[in-house]
Amino acid sequence: MVDQGCEVANHTHDHKYLTKIGAEGIVSQVGSTNQKIQAVCGVSPVLMRPPGGYIDAASLNVLGSMGMPAIMWSIDTRDWQHRNAQRTIDTVLRQVKDGDIILMHDIYSTTADAAVVLIPELTARGYQLVTVSELAAYRGGIAPGHKYSQFRP
């Protein structure tokens, strides 16, 4: 994935909600996952997506001490819930704006089917598909311990 230009972020080892596991739990979940990703992919993640989107000030503070921001989303396709490719496509195309972060889950075949349609369609509409780090860099950067859902112009 890294060789193809994808960015690999941290999503915890056990999909535990950061707001429920305290500082030690966050350090353990995020730290061990960073180590495993480094071992497998050869890169250490610089971004963290909280499971379920659950994040609070205390969790952000811990992530900040680990040098990581929390990356959220501005479009939730709810693909995990309905598992319908056309519904995912319609949601994205109806809502998408420059600087959006779109939440989709690669574990469902219907999401992959939607991506096959969305990628060329979004490109045809003039959107550039970039990593979150690239998007953040284009729009002024990103800081550890902060939460980001989009990067509007």
Positions of predicted regions on the chain:
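Metal-dependent polysaccharide deacetylase catalytic core of the NodB/CE4 family, i.e.
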Residues: 1-108, 142
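C-terminal domain-boundary segment and adjacent tail
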Residues: 110-153
